[in-house]
Regions:
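Axial heme c-ligation environment in periplasmic c-type cytochrome domains
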Residues: 48-55, 70-112, 148-154, 173-198, ...
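Sequence context surrounding c-type heme c attachment/ligation sites in exported
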Residues: 28-35, 61, 125-137, 156-165
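Bacterial N-terminal signal peptides
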Residues: 6-16
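The canonical Cys-X-X-Cys-His
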Residues: 35-43, 96, 133-142, 200
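Positively charged n-region of N-terminal signal peptides that target proteins for export
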Residues: 1-5
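Electrostatic cytochrome c docking/interface patches
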Residues: 17-34, 44-52, 102-130
Length: 208
C-alpha cells in the first residue's frame, strides 16, 4: 500500500504532457461559437440546465481544449455532446476554450455538516495513505483552481452531481481521459467509496 501511494504521488508530480504546449485561443472568436453551448451550459457558462452538467466559466483553457478534442474525436464519449463539435477545427476548439476560460467562475457553497467537511478536507489536502489515495491538492491546488499550464482542471464550484459522476466514472474505468497522465485519476478514485466521493464533491463545490 505504501509503495502504491508513493507511485501514485510520483505520477501526480510529473509534468503534464499536452498535445499543444501553448494556449492559442481567441476569446472573441470563441464567443460566437459559444452561442449554441449556452442552451445547456447557460449564457454565463455556469448555469447548466441539469445538475450533472459542468460549469465551463473560468475553466482552464488547456484542459478545456484537450477535453473538447477528445469529445470531437470520439475518445471521450458524451451522449449530450453528440454532434455538437462536428466540423470544428482545432483552432475552433482553442477559441471556444479561451472564451470560457476568460469568463468569471461561479462560486458554490458546500452543504455538508462540520464532520463531513472536515473529513473531506482531510482527503482533499492529505489523501488517504492507507488506501493509496494521493492528495487532490497535488494537481488541483488548495483552492481547487487546478494548474492551467499543466492542463489540470479547476474543480472549485463544480456542481456536486457532476463531480460525483466523474469520480465514479474514473473509479469504474468508464472515463479514461487521464491516459496522458498515467491513469492518475483512475488510480486516485479506484478505492474511494460512494460516501467519500459524495463528501469530496460537496467540499469541492465550496472551494474558491
Amino acid at each position: 500500500m505504501v509503495f502504491r501511494f508513493l507511485l501514485t504521488f510520483t505520477v501526480l508530480a510529473l509534468p503534464a504532457v499536452s498535445s499543444v504546449v501553448n494556449a492559442m485561443g481567441d476569446p472573441s472568436r470563441g464567443e460566437a461559437q459559444a452561442m449554441v453551448c449556452a442552451a445547456c451550459h447557460g449564457q454565463d457558462g455556469a448555469s447548466g440546465i441539469a445538475p450533472n452538467y459542468p460549469n465551463l466559466a473560468g475553466q482552464n483553457e488547456k484542459y478545456l481544449f484537450n477535453q473538447l478534442k477528445m469529445i470531437a474525436s470520439g475518445e471521450r464519449v458524451l451522449v449530450e455532446m453528440t454532434g455538437q463539435l462536428i466540423g470544428k477545427s482545432e483552432q475552433d476548439l482553442w477559441d471556444l476554450s479561451a472564451y470560457y476560460a476568460n469568463l468569471p467562475s461561479k462560486a458554490g457553497a458546500s452543504a455538508g455538516n462540520d464532520e463531513e467537511l472536515e473529513k473531506a478536507a482531510s482527503i482533499y489536502r492529505g489523501g488517504i495513505a492507507r488506501k493509496g489515495v494521493a492528495a487532490c491538492t497535488a494537481c488541483h491546488s488548495p483552492s481547487g483552481k487546478g494548474n492551467s499550464q499543466a492542463g489540470y482542471p479547476s474543480l472549485a464550484g463544480q456542481p456536486v452531481d457532476y463531480t460525483i459522476a466523474q469520480l465514479t466514472k474514473y473509479r469504474e474505468s468508464v472515463r479514461k481521459t487521464d491516459e496522458s497522465f498515467g491513469g492518475m485519476m483512475r488510480g486516485v478514485a479506484e478505492t474511494l467509496t460512494d460516501s467519500e466521493i459524495a463528501i469530496l464533491a460537496d467540499y469541492i463545490r465550496g472551494l474558491h
